């Protein structure tokens, strides 16, 4: 990953509201493939993922389907149970000392002209996370000033409704490298499951007014971004 030695940034950080909630940490890296280089980037991301997993790291790589940048965007995520575990990650960069296979990969990645870094940040989970192979839809919100707790409570209410229709929901808080954002992550085991859940949600009379509160009235803050990604097998 380009300049990974310098940009290992935490996607979610702890705050006054995460105490008692945090169940995991994620480091997130966005990359964009250059025209004609998508297949090369796919192979490069898979190679790094396989090295990381073989070393015991919980790593998932995704390709974006919908969102800014379209199918040229790629997402690399490292998951950790704690900051102590993160400090002992499989391809440790403490003192710039790497495992040999990871160092070779870093050199290959940084010399590649197939992609460019877009963003990196850290997150902290605010509930139990559901790592796995899913179709992933993400909505990132910026709570109104002084109303973080209100937005989080509304998001937790929404989670109950969505999970009642078959979605798995993860809630994260952005940290270092990003803003004070809340991220609502909708996980589906397949396209068919996603379609079934979405249709049920459209017909849910409890959700209809809450959807207006979020999107039309902007009662809980500003929508920062939304996108869909799927795992690179």
What are these regions (language model features)?
Residues 4-15:
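Sec-dependent N-terminal signal peptides
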């Amino acid at each position: 990953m380009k300049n990974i030695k310098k940009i290992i940034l935490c996607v979610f950080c702890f705050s006054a509201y995460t105490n008692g909630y945090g169940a995991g940490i994620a480091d997130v890296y966005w990359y964009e493939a250059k025209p004609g280089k998508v297949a090369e980037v796919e192979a490069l991301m898979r190679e790094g993922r396989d090295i990381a997993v073989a070393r015991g790291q919980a790593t998932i790589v995704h390709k974006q389907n919908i969102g800014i940048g379209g199918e040229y965007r790629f997402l690399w995520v490292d998951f950790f149970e704690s900051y102590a575990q993160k400090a002992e990650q499989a391809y440790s960069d403490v003192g710039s000392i790497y495992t040999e296979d990871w160092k070779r990969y870093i050199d290959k990645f940084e010399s590649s002209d197939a992609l460019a870094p877009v963003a990196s940040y850290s997150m902290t989970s605010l509930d139990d996370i559901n790592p796995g192979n899913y179709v992933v839809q993400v909505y990132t919100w910026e709570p109104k000033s002084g109303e973080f707790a209100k937005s989080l409570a509304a998001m937790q209410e929404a989670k109950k409704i969505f999970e009642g229709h078959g979605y798995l929901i993860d809630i994260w808080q952005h940290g270092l490298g990003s803003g004070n954002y809340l991220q609502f992550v909708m996980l589906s085991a397949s396209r068919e499951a996603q379609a079934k859940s979405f249709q049920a949600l459209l017909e849910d009379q409890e959700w209809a007014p809450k959807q207006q509160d979020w999107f039309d009235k902007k009662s809980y803050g500003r929508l920062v971004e939304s996108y869909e990604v799927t795992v690179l097998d």
